[in-house]
């Protein structure tokens, strides 16, 4: 799996409208799924669109088709003229445990970080995802970022609501769960935390 992620500013009145137009083209040209979310934290006030692909080849196929679709430009230009682009990253997961949640507009808690040991990132990522899911998360993922934040890694956990995220965070904090992993966490270079609320999605 591969996810392309764009963060940007656009008038609130146009955000969903623009996404609904764009998502039709990504679906038409074969993307796995698309979503739009609003962000709190590191990228506070930004919107983010995430597009799913099977792999890099599939990304190239979809991108070529959209780039050669004249109607795409005609339909999207009015929105692009009001868009201020911030970042673009591809996300490649090392470990991804996220069952389908069709019909749900979930919440994601997301950390960006760096650590020198990629194998340890995967090992600890799997361990932390299990702990979060035991505390109420409905899925989790850890992997690397390629693009604006090249060289960074991402860790995310999914919840059905912001309250469920808060309950899980309080539970793990009260149990001092992460104090048992201080050797790893103290060696992490933290690069940002954000909460993403999914506003619309075509993922199944």
Model-derived features: where do they sit?
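Short S/T/G/P-rich N-terminal loop/turn motif that feeds into the first structured element of a domain
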Residues: 1-179, 183-204
């Amino acid at each position: 799996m591969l996810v392309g992620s764009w963060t940007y500013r656009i008038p609130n009145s146009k955000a969903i409208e623009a996404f609904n137009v764009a998502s039709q083209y990504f679906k038409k040209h074969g993307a796995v799924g698309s979503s739009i979310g609003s962000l709190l934290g590191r990228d506070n006030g930004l919107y983010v669109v995430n597009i799913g692909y099977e792999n890099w080849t599939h990304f190239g196929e979809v991108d070529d088709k959209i780039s050669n679709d004249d109607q795409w430009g005609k339909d999207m230009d009015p929105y692009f003229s009001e868009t201020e682009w911030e970042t673009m990253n591809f996300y490649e997961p090392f470990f991804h445990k996220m069952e389908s949640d069709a019909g749900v507009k979930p919440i994601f808690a997301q950390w960006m970080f760096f650590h020198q040991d990629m194998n340890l990132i995967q090992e600890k990522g799997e361990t932390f995802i299990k702990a979060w899911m035991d505390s109420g998360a409905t899925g989790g993922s850890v992997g690397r970022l390629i693009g604006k934040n090249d060289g960074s890694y991402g860790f995310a956990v999914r919840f059905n609501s912001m309250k469920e995220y808060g309950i899980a965070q309080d539970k793990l904090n009260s149990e001092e769960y992460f104090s048992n992993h201080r050797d790893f966490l103290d060696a992490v270079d933290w690069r940002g935390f954000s909460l993403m609320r999914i506003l619309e999605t075509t993922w199944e």
